Amino acid sequence: MNPFFIFREPSKEICHCYTQSEKPTVIASLAALDGRKGLVIAPFFNDDNNAIYLLDGQDSTSTTLPLDGSKGFDTIPDWQDDFSFSIETTSPREGYHNAFTRFHKHLEHNTFQKLVLARSIIEQKDEKTSPRNIFLNACKKYPRSYIALFFTEETGMWLIASPEILLNGNADGYQTMALAGTMKYEGEDMRWSAKIKRNNNSLPITSATACSHLPQR
């Protein structure tokens, strides 16, 4: 299967689909993205075992499709593979308790000022589960989130559902939202509290994005 990247912007009724026949370009570092255009797939930490990939193929197609599935949804896979993960024996509640205890210990000892606890859960898939259904269900369930589905042989298939609008605006100005969904959405005119500013200042974040446009207000 060829590499693809499909995304739905917050509160939109359409999705953007990109496919290419070539393998993704391997990028050595975030700095090497300077001047490049394309869709970036990057790990949290880049090293020899965690490469950055750029979808910038010459033999590529880009389409815009309605989310109602009325046309063109062959771009989104509607099949299952045979791969399955082993179900964990530890209950989600017990796993969370163990992880929280370890985190809390380091906070009490002032090893770190702030930690973000990320968890994973493995669920059995049924016969109705497919990348297409998962993407469309995510778009329906989270209308104000950025939803994306992408695949390359090098990275596997990933679904993204992000509540944050990292940057939004035009020539008149820009705005951003609290990271990690720490503020409830209450309209466009939101202001960060002193606590939110302090917490986000302690997060080491590097962002490299090739933007073809910014949404107009």
Describe every region a protein language model picked out:
Residues M1-E13:
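N-terminal basic/disordered segments at the start of proteins
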Residues N2-F4, G35-G38, R144-I147, G156-M157:
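Short, surface-exposed beta-edge/turn micro-motifs
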Residues E13-C15, E22-P24, T182-K184:
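Short, surface-exposed beta-strand-loop junctions and turns on beta-sheet-rich folds
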Residues E13-C15, N50, G156-W158, G173-Q175:
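Hydrophobic residues embedded in beta-strands of well-ordered beta-sheets
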Residues T19, R36, I165-R217:
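Cytosolic ligand/metal-binding cores
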Residues T19-Q124, T129, E188, A194, ...:
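Non-catalytic accessory segments adjacent to catalytic cores
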Residues A42-F44, R119-I121, F150-E154, A161-P163, ...:
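Short, structured patches in soluble enzyme cores that scaffold and shape functional sites
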Residues E127-N170:
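SIR2/sirtuin-family catalytic core signature
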